[in-house]
C-alpha cells in the first residue's frame, strides 16, 4: 500500500468538479489502452532501456537508436562549446572515478583558455561505459523533442523500473518533459492494485480495490493533452510491472468491466490508506458534498495496529522543535517567525481539523480543510497538537525508532543505563547497555490516527472487512453510500 496521501494537487482538481447528473445514455467502455504519466514533477533526466532490444524513433519517424544499451534523454546539459580545443583528457577509470570531478576540471580549463561552456536545452545519447563522458550526443535540439520507445523481446525500463507497452518522451500541459507509458488497461489496473495495497491481502479487498481503481479511471480520463492519468498519488499509484502479481491480475479479471455508479454515472471513487476509524464527508476535504461520500464508521481500520509495517497508519506521532517547525512551514510558504502555538479552530464531527491557526513571533496564518497535512507533514487531519517544555525521557536500547526520532529533535543523552553480564563459560564480565535517559528540547507534538484524506474507501478498513467475511460489493456499498455495481465494459 502506498501511504502517501493524495494532497494538494488532487484537492485542486476535485475542487472544480461539479456533481454529476444522472445520464440517459449508456456508459461507454474504458479504452483498451491508456497513457500514464510515470514521471515526477520537473523531470529533466530519463534513463530508458529494455530487457530486450530497444528502438527509439523521433516524431518524424526517423530511427535514432536501435540496440541493447540504455539511453539518456536530458534537459539543460552543460557542455564545452568546442571540446576539441581543451587539453582535458579522460584518464583511466581508476584515476578518474568521479564524473563530477572531471567536469570541474573541464570547466576550470575552459575558464583558463576562454573556451565557453554552453547549455544544451535537450539532448539524447547512449549510456556508455564511462570512458568518454564528454562524448557528443546522438541528437540535440533547442527544445524538448518527442521520442517513441519500443522494446522487442523484452520490457521497457525507465529509471530502473520495468513497464509493459511503449514509452513516449513528450510534454505535459505546462510544457515540461515527461515520460508516458502506453499500456493495456487491464495491466494498468493490475499494477495499481499491487501498487496501492499488498498483493497478499484478501481477495475481496483486492477486488474492491480493482472496482474502485477502475471507477476512478473512468472519471479521470481525457484531462490532459498528451496523457490520460498521473501514475502517482496525484491520481493512482502505478509501479509498472512491479505492482503486478497473480492475485492482482485475478482481481482485475474477476471484476472485469465493473464500476461503482450513482444515479447511473461513475462515482468519484476516492480512497485512502486508513480512515482512523471513521471516514469523512467529502465537503470537509474537497469542494462538493457528494451524497455517496458521507462519513461512515470504519472500525476495521484498527487491524493495522497489529502490522509491523502498517501500524503507523493507525496511530502516529510527529514532533518538531520550534526552529524545525519554522523551517518546515517556511519551505511551504508560511512565515510567522518562531512558532509559539497552533490553535485548532474548527473540527468536523469526526474530529478532523477543518481549520487551524499558526501563531508566531511575527504574525499568524490560518490554514483550512486538508491543508494541515501538507503544512505540518502529517499523515491525516485527525490529530491533536500539544506543546511540551524541556523534559527527560527514558528509552530502551531496543527502541531504535524512538532513538532515531530523538536524535532528529536534537535530544541529548544525560545518562546511560547498563548492567554487568557474566559469561557462564568464562570468568569475564561484559557491559550491556539497557537504555538511555534523554533531555528533550521544547517541542510541538502532533498525535493522530489514520493516513490520507479519509474520504471514501479505507484500504485497511476494506482488508479488515474482507477478513471478517465481507464481499467486495459489501465493502464498496459500506464506504460509498447508495451506489450500484454496474457493468461498464472493457478491462
Listing of model-derived features with the role each one plays in the protein:
Residues 2-491:
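Conserved, single-site charged/polar hotspot
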